[in-house]
């Protein structure tokens, strides 16, 4: 795992990071002013009655601070119970007569450029899900299907070894689409950059 992608979470709509399916929508935002408009519009949209009554899962708006591609500066991560549930949600937001969707879409389109999307499915998560974890390190990698069982077992062993000292949460996911050569990834959450650096320093000494 040579590559690390570091992101900071701007906004979270709910507390859950345990949904088995999570979809990333990647966007490019040119400046902080446009980013602020997107944050405000997202917050308003996720607080609407339409979302409260129809969206099952959670949404997280993230900013890339290191390791991302030039084309992407931010991403929306939608965590939902299944791909089927996500398809239901997509059908609802595709209604051209939905005013809440139209308002949100107009702000998003005026202040960002769509880059792509990725579909991921959690294999296993570890630690306690918390929206206090706003700094996320992502470690994508490629492996053969025949290696996955051994990787899961090694991850379980790692969790047992660090569960009493590791301050954050982490998960192992399979990348189903949009990842190019990548097949899997680890996501590791911390409350702050300082917490991440402190853990990395202590782990390297152990």
Show which residues each predicted segment covers.
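Short S/T/G/P-rich N-terminal loop/turn motif that feeds into the first structured element of a domain
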Residues: 17-206
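Sec-dependent N-terminal signal peptides
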Residues: 4-14
């Amino acid at each position: 795992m040579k590559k690390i992608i570091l992101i900071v979470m701007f906004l979270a709509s709910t507390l859950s990071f345990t949904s088995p399916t999570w979809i990333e929508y990647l966007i490019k935002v040119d400046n902080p002013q446009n980013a602020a408009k997107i944050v405000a519009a997202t917050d308003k949209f996720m607080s609407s009655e339409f979302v409260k009554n129809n969206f099952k899962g959670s949404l997280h708006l993230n900013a890339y601070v290191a390791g991302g591609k030039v084309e992407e500066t931010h991403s929306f991560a939608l965590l939902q119970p299944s791909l089927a549930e996500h398809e239901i949600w997509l059908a609802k937001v595709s209604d051209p007569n939905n005013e809440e969707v139209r308002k949100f879409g107009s702000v998003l389109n005026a202040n960002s450029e769509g880059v792509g999307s990725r579909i991921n499915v959690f294999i296993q998560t570890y630690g306690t899900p918390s929206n206090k974890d706003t700094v996320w390190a992502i470690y994508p990698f490629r492996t053969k299907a025949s290696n996955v069982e051994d990787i899961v077992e090694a991850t379980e062993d790692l969790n047992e070894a660090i569960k009493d000292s590791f301050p954050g949460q982490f998960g192992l996911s399979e990348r189903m689409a949009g990842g190019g050569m990548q097949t899997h990834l680890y996501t590791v959450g911390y409350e702050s950059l300082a917490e991440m650096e402190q853990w990395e320093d202590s782990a390297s000494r152990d």
